[in-house]
A protein has these predicted regions:
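NAD(P)H-binding glycine-rich loop region in Rossmannoid oxidoreductase-like domains
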Residues: 1-35
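Short-chain dehydrogenase/reductase
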Residues: 33, 82-90, 126-138, 168-169
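Alpha-helical substrate-binding/gating segment
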Residues: 116-119, 138-160, 167-190
Length: 190
């Protein structure tokens, strides 16, 4: 509410606000459901009161669960999630679908992506976690700058040539550009 009051010309919102550690979501499901769903509901309510009609939701490929085949396409079924974090993304997407049906003036883009990595050269966009990182790239970065001696690779029984896991990554700068493009598309009342 405060941000909309201070900046009354806001025409779009990008929803990044969420807890995002998959492992932690398994041990703290109530916190994940409360935070991740409530953030979206509050934002949508404030947007409605300020006549803001463009919403980009930072979803996740976790909505697809553990698909039987790859590559995953946008029309794959969602909902068979394997953790509470993924389920919060599915529930939020469903909430947005319902709100759009009730309010045709609301334009929503759901962006489902895999593992954001990297940083902007300014250092303003990217991950430099406090404590133990939740994903691989912060470990690689720590090795690169000499804060860590080596990266440990866990798992050797995956169905890959060397037995290690395969991941899909997207650079944070590309991700930021994609979100800006989504806003521009929504603002044309697509």
């Amino acid at each position: 509410e405060h941000i909309f009051s201070e900046c009354p010309d806001i025409t779009a919102v990008i929803q990044f606000a969420a807890y995002k550690a998959v492992g932690e979501s398994v041990s703290k499901p109530i916190e994940y459901y409360y935070n991740n769903l409530n953030c979206t509901l509050v934002i949508l309510d404030v947007m409605r009161h300020h006549n803001c009609h463009n919403f980009v939701f930072s979803s996740s490929a976790t909505v697809y669960g553990d698909p039987a085949s790859v590559p995953i396409t946008e029309d794959f079924p969602t909902g068979a999630t394997t953790n509470p974090y993924g389920t919060t993304k599915v529930f939020t997407e469903r909430i947005l679908q319902d709100v759009c049906k009730a309010d045709p003036s609301l334009n929503v883009a759901l962006l489902r992506y895999f593992n954001p990595i990297g940083a902007h050269k300014s250092g303003l966009i990217g991950e430099d976690p406090n404590g133990i990182p939740n994903n691989l790239m912060p470990y690689i970065a720590k090795v690169a700058v000499g804060k860590l001696e080596k990266v440990h690779v866990f798992g050797n029984d995956y169905p890959t040539p060397d037995g290690t896991g395969v991941r899909d990554y997207i650079h944070v700068v590309d991700l930021a550009r994609g979100h800006v493009c989504a806003i521009k598309k929504l603002e044309t009342n697509c």
